């Protein structure tokens, strides 16, 4: 990383540099656009261009100062047509008060005042100049400044501030938006000083696949407990001891009580010794009709 030209108080912390490297913000593509050469550190033997992380940090601070200079946060429009950046722009908008356009950008948002979605922002921030080309083109028609996350192969036409970073990985995109939001809050005074940690974790800015999350929940609900889990549950509830050959205290009590009751009933019936048929049969020489009570005649 090249030496920074920033004042010492704005220098990145070792944790910030580790996060940028872990999210692979320094890995560009194999193609290089001529206007992105100043942000290039070197090219690896496999052809991948490596971005200078120091330049990335400097541009994040510059973009944050521009954003903090706008009085009304709602006049800032953050845009991402790329799925990996949609969650990040929504979180950025909720934390800074900006207006988010996540998904398809409707043509005419900045130029056609008849449409309901017409907007007049003072600044727009896009995730990828290639996928958000329509927004940049319309911004150029109405003189709106543009901040963009630019990879080594990104076109920089009509881009006023380019933040050199990997804009194709979900972790890299989420981390840059998170760092940008944190610096904006620091400059606005929401965070007391630069030593104050932001309580929002960077994971909230990462893209999550809805189908993968849904399948994960379904798999957890339909998961069949294994033998180890069943055994552990039985030991905790007291129905089985740690040694399966030896019953725990109280184990099998319902079965023992039922067996004892059955044995007692069988003993009492055998002791009676009487003939059930004899007790219900009429005496000899009498008919069934004679044994029935006679009804009173009126």
From Swiss-Prot:
Region of interest called Disordered, as start-end residue ranges on this chain: 240-298
InterPro entries noted in UniProt: Ribosomal_uS2 (IPR001865), Ribosomal_uS2_C (IPR032281), Ribosomal_uS2_CS (IPR018130), Ribosomal_uS2_euk (IPR027498), Ribosomal_uS2_euk/arc (IPR005707), Ribosomal_uS2_flav_dom_sf (IPR023591)
Subcellular localization(s) per the UniProt record: Cytoplasm
Biased composition (Low complexity): 248-271
Pfam family, one: 40S_SA_C
GO annotation terms (biological process): ribosomal small subunit assembly; translation
Major localization class: cytoplasm
GO CC terms of this entry: cytosolic small ribosomal subunit
Keyword Ribosomal protein: yes
Ranges of compositional bias, category Polar residues: 289-298
Record-level Gene Ontology MF annotations: structural constituent of ribosome
Alphabetic keyword roster: Cytoplasm, Ribonucleoprotein, Ribosomal protein
Function: Required for the assembly and/or stability of the 40S ribosomal subunit. Required for the processing of the 20S rRNA-precursor to mature 18S rRNA in a late step of the maturation of 40S ribosomal subunits.
Family: Belongs to the universal ribosomal protein uS2 family.
Description of how the protein assembles with itself and partners: Component of the small ribosomal subunit. Mature ribosomes consist of a small (40S) and a large (60S) subunit. The 40S subunit contains about 33 different proteins and 1 molecule of RNA (18S). The 60S subunit contains about 49 different proteins and 3 molecules of RNA (25S, 5.8S and 5S). Interacts with rps21.
Name of the molecule in the record: Small ribosomal subunit protein uS2
